[in-house]
Amino acid sequence: MLGQPGQAAGDPAGVAIRRDGSFVVALSGTNQVGTGRPDSFELARVSVGRRPTGLWLAPNGARAIVTCELDDGIDVIDLGATPSATSISLGPRPELTPFDRGERLFFDASLSRNGWMSCHSCHTDGHSNGRLADTLGDGHYGNAKRVLSLLGTIDTRPWAWDGRMSTLRAQVTHSVATTMRGAPPTPRQLGDLVAFIEGLEQPAPARLSTIARQPVEVLRGQRLFGQLDCRRCHAPPLYTTPDTYDVGIGDLKANPPSLRGVSQRPRLFHDNRARSLEEVIGKFEHQLPRELTERERRDLLSFLRSL
């Protein structure tokens, strides 16, 4: 409904329904606002500021106000027969740094073929949408894998599930070309995207209150982590290693993702088969040399959630 061949609608965001049943939608990846009807494929578009997201209708439905996150401004949309936009700045704009320019590119669907997707489409706000994606990241189709988080990724080289990319620049170039099907980024675009991704910090543990209440369990779990030789693949302080390993999943040799922030992942393993850390340890007994006692499982879980 929103996108057409040759004119996509990457990353639709805020939407509002008018009294006559028509709708107004912010197309955050293409920097546009569209108006249309649910029974039609026609979408009238008007260009607005960078990354329009929030959208509100005036009480009479004649205008819409949209916030443009990356332009520090708002746009007022006249919803007449031919929609038009008036931009309102919220103040002086500082000179953009490479990080700032990279952030704009990260959320910009024009990097992809016809504007169907942005980096943010899969790596939500630099993190992960938690879904499986069958891309050419490993050189072929037919082996869908969980979208990896980019938070703290600068410290966890190499890149891609199979560790084939030794530099972040190579990984970004490859993703734009094969996953997004876009034109190769210019040297400046590539440098800016890398600057933004390098600036994404690792998330804090999701359960800090639990950690504070269980310091003894966390310490016991840390010792157990070493005794079970989990460090062989997930070596501190980054809790990963630069090598690839046979993890017993088909013919895939995987570079282990960092365990930092692992408590914030709703699904685990390359194919999302584990729905929790409890399943990784209890149901799948992932790479464990022996069966754990109930207390050992609790201790190991407490430690992993502290990372």
Stretches with model-predicted labels:
Residues 1-307:
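Periplasmic c-type cytochrome electron-transfer domains
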